[in-house]
């Protein structure tokens, strides 16, 4: 595993946190209690509506967003790379994306910032079917592993292999796009890296395939927030009231999901009728522990500064980023808009 940041990085984190407070200085100091009118607020999902978005749909259905003055409208992207591009272009108000994608976008100069974590740890996993005789990462030696062709997934695979003492040259990486499950079922690859333990793994279990599932953060990849809520940095300075209201309402939505996962699954199903109901409910139930911070007393959405620093440093060391995120000035995230986190 990657070790903790040395003292200079810890100092950089402290400086970054000070910048975070300045970043949101224009935001509300107290949680929103009521609002007489509503303002349209467009949120582009990271992918099609699914269990990962249950809190969002619950907050919409229960009127939590309307209660704080927001008329939230989810938008489905045409491709996975679209949300952050649309956000940077000013065409949407918020994007649900991935911590690695946000760091890549910022490295290219996009002034974006995460205001909350929707899923607090990696969902990305190495998945294999029993017939391939893969029970540990070491068993991948000499085999073909499928990925979606995403740069940081290749780096995650290499890190996992090196962590297990396997020469990456002994493993053939195959780009199977988003056809991860078909590639395993057909035997095209012995395993995949890119599927989620709360989705593709459950899908295979429902098919009685009994997959082996190895989350990447358990085999050498630093922990990171799989899904984050991203806004433009300028809006984080000027629209603090709306962002605080959004997070307050979303927190209520998360509590509703936790209280009644079955009802939340029906809302997700209504948003995307093509989904398999059993898969959505099981996915919601298994994802619930990952929706809250590991640190006791921290609110829903909390982002760990040490964790972000370690993962950003890992991406830089892997050659995925041109600059170390700790040295770029504007922090990649802020916790300022979470309920109870204002000053």
Where are these regions (language model features)?
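Short, surface-exposed acidic
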Residues: 168-172, 273-285, 322-330
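C-terminal motif of bacterial Sec signal peptides marking the signal peptidase cleavage site
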Residues: 21-25
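Bacterial N-terminal signal peptides that target proteins for export
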Residues: 2-14
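Conserved C-terminal helix/tail region of periplasmic/extracytoplasmic solute-binding proteins
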Residues: 308-343
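Short, glycine-/small- and polar/acidic-enriched structural segments
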Residues: 32-177, 181-198, 213-215
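Pocket-lining segment of extracytoplasmic ligand-binding domains
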Residues: 100, 179-182, 188-274
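Bacterial signal peptide processing site
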Residues: 27-29
